[in-house]
Curated annotation (Swiss-Prot):
It comes from Vanderwaltozyma polyspora (strain ATCC 22028 / DSM 70294 / BCRC 21397 / CBS 2163 / NBRC 10782 / NRRL Y-8283 / UCD 57-17). The chain crosses the membrane at residues 22-42. The active site is at S347 (charge relay system). GO terms for biological process: multivesicular body membrane disassembly; neutral lipid catabolic process; pexophagy; phosphatidylserine catabolic process; piecemeal microautophagy of the nucleus; vacuolar protein processing. Keywords: Autophagy, Endosome, Glycoprotein, Hydrolase, Lipid degradation, Lipid metabolism, Membrane, Signal-anchor, Transmembrane, Transmembrane helix. This is Putative lipase ATG15. Residues 519-528 have a biased composition (Basic and acidic residues). It catalyses: a triacylglycerol + H2O = a diacylglycerol + a fatty acid + H(+). The gene is ATG15. PROSITE patterns: LIPASE_SER (PS00120). GO terms for cellular component: endoplasmic reticulum; multivesicular body membrane; vacuolar lumen; vacuolar membrane.
Amino acid sequence: MISNDYTKFSSKRRSLRYSNRILLLMGTILLIVVYFYSDILVDKSIIMFRNENKGQMLSGSFTLRHIYRHGVDKGHRTQEVLDITKQNEDAFGRYFKRELDEFNANAVGLNTDDPLRELWTSDKQFITDNPFNFKFGLKGNKQILHRMVDRDPSFIEPYLDFARESPDMAAKVTIDWVEGGEVVVVPDITDKNTVVSLALMSSNAYVRLPYTDDWRNVSLPWDSNDTPGYGWESNGIRGHVFVNDLENIVVISIKGTSAQGLPGSGEDETTGNDKLNDNLLFSCCCARVSYLWTTVCDCYLKSYTCDETCLEQAIKEKDHYYQAAMDIYKDTLRQYPHATIWLTGHSLGGALASLVGRTYGLPTVAFESPGELLAAKRLHLPFPPGLPSYDEGIWHIGHTADPIYMGTCNGASSTCSIAGYAMETGCHSGKQCVYDVVRDKGWHVNMLNHRIHTVIDGILTKYDKVATCHEPDPCVDCYNWNFMPHGKKPKKQTTSSSSEKVDTSTTKSIDRTTITTRTNEKKWHPNPKDPSTTTTDDKTLMSSCLHRNWVGICTEYTTFTKRLI
């Protein structure tokens, strides 16, 4: 009897032992599966967060890996990249120290508490003596973005060209969008350190580079006989590429405007072309503010009337900044095809980042960007159907003391106009995150408050919390202009009296209400004081500017005849 009980007990114990071994084996297999599955997730750039409501620190720190420079004008086919290595980052650091010493030596009498802040932040958490090897820590969130199914540049660019050439036909084309949206890792713009880090990445693109011969030509197609000549590298756009340790998140920072007379600018900077592209993207019609201004394109027809098709063609010209920014993105995508790419930039760089981000459905954080919504519409960039633009992955961060960001730096007496900038737009796409420093700190509205390091040291690092992002207020740019599609004649100007009246009419081509100024009944003639146009019967002798100085005044003209339509 005892023997039978012992046998049963031994049998149960062996069964229990085998069961434990089976459970242990299954647990080991499960851990192996989870381990390899998590590797797959990392390779696909999908980051799993422990808390869905709070941003999590992304794996690995972000460092500068590549610097792009892209030519414009005659050198618009040329693009080069500089890979950051230990050797050249040390050399760049020594150059930065020399530049800082030079600035300190010339800073006598300048109204600045710390000369370093004009070249880099003086905040203790981010201070460094070498911006080229600084390690950034960023947080991210998961967000559903509505993006096109096919976002390959080989599809996007021909579609945009078609939409610009035949907007009516393009409106009938159905674009495939990802059904229900797509989960994408986006910057956590509620985290102060992340916002400051992205702003510093934007400022990094302004830091001057010493001469080096380590640039690689990545132009497509590349032809050694097709060289732009001397000086192209200081006459274009720059993009700085930051990558984390796992190479699954990439941040592209696009350089903004270099303004003559501001710290960090000079003859080796891109002042002239920056101003041309500013005036092309953010003016109502080719920077035609008054008859005293020389236009940056030939689309102005008459008073408050502009050739819309001509304007759209001018913005998309291959030798301008928008195309150059897209080329920088395309080569970065070629190097990191499986990474999630973010865009950032300050001022003009922020606007270009926003335009490229909307083109390819990329998360974008722009700082102090002028209103770019009008430029996005003129470029016929894709907007998700039925989804308001503010519900997308684009954030515009700025403050109330910056007239460029707020859209108030216009008019003949404004500082922008005096400096030769026609900043006439104020409407942003995406969401706006505004610091009210006028109310909170008593700041005065001043164009000098537009500088990136004023924003970083005076606002972003001083506030305890980041600004709340919200949908922009209803906004219409250039409401008093008539934009005529190609082939359409401007309406004759008639009225019952010789006094000037203001009438409200609707223009179908732009699908918005415009205010048109009507004068007495007679054939329109150009202002005799305007040197840019001369009318002969049904033809107009027009002049186009070939070269400008930094103020924007034309120094060389070319003339041509244009038939009135």
